[in-house]
Amino acid sequence: MSIEGKDLKFPAYVWEAPVRLWHWTMALAMIVLWGTGYFIGAPMPSVPGEASENYLMGYIRFAHFAAGYVFALAFLFRIYWAIVGNKHAREIFLVPLSMLDPTWWRGFFRVVSHYCFIRPKNDWHLGHNQLAMAAMFGMYVLGTVFMIVTGFALYGEGTLMGSWANTMFTSWVIPLIGDSQLVHTWHHLCAWYLFWFTIVHLYFVIREDITSGLTVVSSMISGWRDVKN
């Protein structure tokens, strides 16, 4: 494949079914986590009555914990599929190695110049372009790892000493960061960080689908990338 994408063959099967399933599972989990996390951080006023009859915040916390498990397990599965799947499945995890290749950087700056409206047309790519790879690794992958680690550290506070979450995460994450409140704060800030990253991600995906001449959005549904008629 040339850096301009002239040697690509279409249609091409890019996103395997497990990658597509992971993508939409993570999207749904993140929506639940953002929604429930917002109310955990800014809970509604208390209501009168028996706690057993007014358990709304309890249900919200349970939904947050359940979605957190789905989020973490889906990410672990994604790492596994990066090992056994096709080359596009591991693009977002190999960015530090890709950066050692000078041609990768040439492609990176070509993509950046397109998004800055300096170049009218972007190069065609089967999977992620270089900027997307860097963003997915530096923002999504690292951000997700941070959210999982801090999330289970906070979860382990409630499950108390002796639980797997407390032993594997709480016991070292909270002392490392400083205290429980700081972990809450950084977990909260990273949630907003991932939220705005997702908004920008949606903008670029939709923009690329409109301007590139390739099927971008639909490829994450069908798995196939093709030239639009």
Regions found by a protein language model. Name each.
Residues M1-N229:
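Membrane-embedded alpha-helical bundles that constitute the cytochrome b-like, heme-associated redox core
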